[in-house]
Amino acid sequence: IVKATPLQDRMRQERRLANQFKSPFKGLPKEVSVLTAISFLVAVGFGLIIPAIPIFAKTFGVSNTLIGLIISSFAIMRFVSGLFSGKLVDRFGERVVLGFGLFMVSIFTLLAGLAQSYEQLLIFRTAGGLGSSMFSVSAGALILRVVADNQRGRAQSLYNGGFIAGGVAGPAFGGALIALSPRAPFFIYSALLIAAGTVSMIYLHESRLGARVESQQEYFLLVGLGFVLYVCQMEQILWFDQC
């Protein structure tokens, strides 16, 4: 009997440990891990600007009511444009709409950070909600399309987990950036969205996608409503903390 060397024993132990701690993405299409990474980047950036919005809006000398409108305009536009975004996905495909939506939010977030008046900030924040709707609807459609029925729950939980993790990390860094300038979080968020959009265009390929599922516009409408409630709850908490 040949006795194993210490190196061989260590390699066997490493293999056993690797088998015990399997990746949660194991067995899922590559698109799921890519979408999870994208959702994390988006959520980090979104969390960056949440504490900055009320402070930035105050610099224009407007009332609390108008500041509240800035806070809610993004979520409202995201909600009302859900069905329109679903039609875009049906016509142009998930990857195109997802990438275009991310770049659209990036541009309008940058413009919001450069806003010189309350009206400009309101318009740019509202327009960004349309791009955000395009991203979320196309990402949801892509998961439905590439993941088998018996794996969709796990895929959706990983995707949502990426967003939640980013949402937890973002506000902490956003608070630090405000000390530099209330505009700074907008610029960082815009850069993160460009990175996320680039990742989507590189790693999500239409040629690998399966047949499309039937239109899920009602589902996307409910997702949009859930996002509105989530955003309003988070931003109201932060807004009242600023009062």
Enumerate the language-model features and the residues they cover:
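Cytoplasmic helix-loop-helix junction between adjacent transmembrane helices
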Residues: F124-F163
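Helix-loop-helix hairpin linking two adjacent transmembrane segments in secondary transporters
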Residues: Y159-M201
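Interfacial helix-cap and linker-helix signal at transmembrane-aqueous boundaries
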Residues: A57-K58, L88-V89, F173-A179
